[in-house]
Amino acid sequence: MVQEEKAMEAINDALRALRKRHLLEEGAHAPAISALSKPLISQGSEWKEKTEKLETELQQCYKAQSRLSEQLVIEVAESRTSKAILQEKELLINDLQKELTQRREDCTRLQEELEEKTKTVDVLIAENLEIRSQLEEMTSRVQKAETENKMLIDRWMLQKMQDAERLNEANDLYEEMLAKLKANGLETLARQQVDGIVRRNEDGTDHFVESTIPSTCANRIHAHEGGCGSIVFEYNSGTLFTGGQDRAVKMWDTNSGTLIKSLYGSLGNILDMAVTHDNKSVIAATSSNNLFVWDVSSGRVRHTLTGHTDKVCAVDVSKFSSRHVVSAAYDRTIKLWDLHKGYCTNTVLFTSNCNAICLSIDGLTVFSGHMDGNLRLWDIQTGKLLSEVAGHSSAVTSVSLSRNGNRILTSGRDNVHNVFDTRTLEICGTLRASGNRLASNWSRSCISPDDDYVAAGSADGSVHVWSLSKGNIVSILKEQTSPILCCSWSGIGKPLASADKNGYVCTWT
């Protein structure tokens, strides 16, 4: 705008200069015109006309010049605008050229990446084809193995049925011998006749004793400060071992209710106990992740079995050997221990925490009860799972084997007690009572030594006794007020012992 104003001002100055010059020239020639006008009066009118005509032409020239000046100003402005637009276009072209160069570089890079990805895809396709080939081969092998496994299972089931039939025949013979024994009192003759079938002779220390139905509290003992978590009798004896939260193991005479001795050295609460078949050692599973083995005669710790990484909640010892012990802990392992060597000889791994275990009569199979409610059977030598049964809807708290080894009792947090046939793993009895509620994940039930009764404690302090053959309650024992944690039956038929959460132990006859 400033430049346009300057241009208009310059044009106006030029017009004024021309008018001034015209006036000066007109004034300068006025005398000559006057002198000539005299002789030329005759031509005055002609010259006047020409003058007027020239003035008219001059005015037209001025007007044309003014229009040209205005047009010039417009053209100059348009030229400057076009120049600015041209500069903008040049800048835009430069930016577009740079962007084009960048896009070309990106295109080159993407092309290289595409080639690399294509090569990778080709390699993956080749690997996929190879894996598919391997998968087809493995599938074929699995199908073949499944077929062979099915055949082996069928053969094993057939063999199992045959073994069960033979065992049933032996049991029938055994029951017949027991009937004769009870009728005629020929105990010695009966034991010799059935020796090698179910029972061993007196040298093996197992013999038949008829159990009595407990009804009376013979002794009420304050055994431990805090809860008493485990009790166990010596084999074929009335001597009772108790273990509690005070980390002590105590030995009691159940006839008089007096303390025989105390065993110290445990670094944790006693959660479970077992006594060797020769009654020389007692083993305690503790919350300190260890097992402690005491020599009963000296009262000293013979072994400290280390290897578990969490609390050891269950332990059992071989029925025939005083050498082999199994334990279960919350590190989800079962360990086999050699007491002669004092260390672990085998470890079994599983996924659900184990609350209770027991060994079979031959010491080759471990029965374990787990938090998922299942009963599992393990080959202790190979560590392989032999079988699994869904026995309870909640955690299994106790696993007990009958004296003849044909039945196994499991108790669960669903307040149900199941009796399984160890040969077929079928439930042959289910025991429950409206007032019987288990107090903890380690509430222990037990079977009487003659395999006729089952005893289990309840959270209300009572102990329920069922007839195994009839499935009905034959006795309810009420003396304790705290939740019952465990029960144990003496191998000589009586007494039955129960321990509660306050550390009291009652013996029942």
Swiss-Prot record:
- Check the record and name the SUPFAM superfamilies matching this protein: WD40 repeat-like
**What is the designated name of this protein?**
Autophagy-related protein 16
Coiled-coil spans are none
Q: Which Pfam families match?
A: ATG16, WD40
What does the similarity note say? Belongs to the WD repeat ATG16 family.
GO biological process terms held by the UniProt record: autophagosome assembly; protein transport
Annotated organism of origin: Arabidopsis thaliana (Mouse-ear cress)
The answer, when asked if Nucleus is one of the entry's keywords, is no
The keyword Repeat is annotated on this UniProt entry: yes
- Protein role: May play a role in autophagy.
Q: Which spans of this chain does UniProt mark as WD repeats? A: 223-262, 265-304, 307-347, 349-388, 391-430, 437-478, 480-509
Keywords from UniProt, A to Z, are:
Autophagy, Protein transport, Repeat, Transport, WD repeat
**What gene is this protein a product of?**
ATG16
